[in-house]
């Protein structure tokens, strides 16, 4: 859970870069949208996983696809040149709509939630109860992670802009 939530991905990078440019308070609306989208993606994937037979080839494909996606994403992120990660001062402010939309195009999230639901849904009781339990745990941890990344981005830029420290 911690690896999926605290490693860099679209949500974390958006939270840190947006707060670095616009300040930590600017992320409140964005984070609310991220949570709404995150919960929606969990409910969609949980409902699909609940309906798929665990012994099916499709279920195995989803499981392995999610794992391979994480590995590939990690390799790609580690190989990115640092120049590509520079902060552009012209970044527009984002709001809850962007936070929601990001969840539907965030491949890391879809893979992460798929793997979590496939591996743990039955252990959490299955059905809507299991889906809601997993959703509440991962959403809480994800929100805490986004808050941490938000304050990190804000503090980092404040330090770099300071005449004495930066």
Can you say where each PLM-predicted feature lies in the sequence?
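Juxtamembrane transmembrane-helix termini in multi-pass membrane transport proteins
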Residues: 1-60, 115-134
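Alpha-helical transmembrane segments and their lipid-water interface positions
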Residues: 11, 37-49, 70-73, 110, ...
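Selected transmembrane alpha-helices and immediately adjacent juxtamembrane segments
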Residues: 103-113
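Alpha-helical membrane-protein architecture signal
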Residues: 93-101, 129-133
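Cytoplasmic-side transmembrane-helix entry/capping segments in multi-pass membrane proteins
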Residues: 33, 90-92
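Selective transmembrane alpha-helices of multi-pass membrane proteins
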Residues: 55-85, 139-149, 157-166
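Short helix-coil transition sites and intra-membrane helix breaks within transmembrane domains
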Residues: 4-8, 105-106, 146
């Amino acid at each position: 859970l911690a690896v999926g939530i605290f490693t860099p991905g679209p949500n974390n990078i958006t939270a840190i870069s947006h707060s670095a440019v616009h300040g930590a308070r600017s992320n409140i609306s964005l984070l609310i949208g991220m949570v709404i989208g995150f919960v929606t993606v969990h409910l969609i994937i949980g409902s699909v996983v609940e309906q798929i037979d665990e012994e099916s080839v499709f279920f195995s494909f989803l499981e392995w696809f999610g794992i391979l996606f994480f590995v590939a994403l990690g390799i790609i992120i580690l190989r990115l040149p640092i120049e590509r990660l520079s902060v552009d001062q012209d970044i527009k402010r984002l709001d809850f709509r962007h936070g929601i939309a990001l969840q539907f195009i965030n491949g890391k999230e879809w893979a992460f939630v798929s793997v979590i639901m496939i591996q743990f849904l039955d252990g959490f009781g299955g059905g809507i109860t299991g889906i809601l339990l997993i959703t509440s745990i991962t959403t809480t941890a994800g929100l805490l992670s986004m808050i941490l990344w938000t304050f990190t981005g804000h503090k980092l830029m404040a330090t770099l802009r300071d005449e004495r420290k930066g």
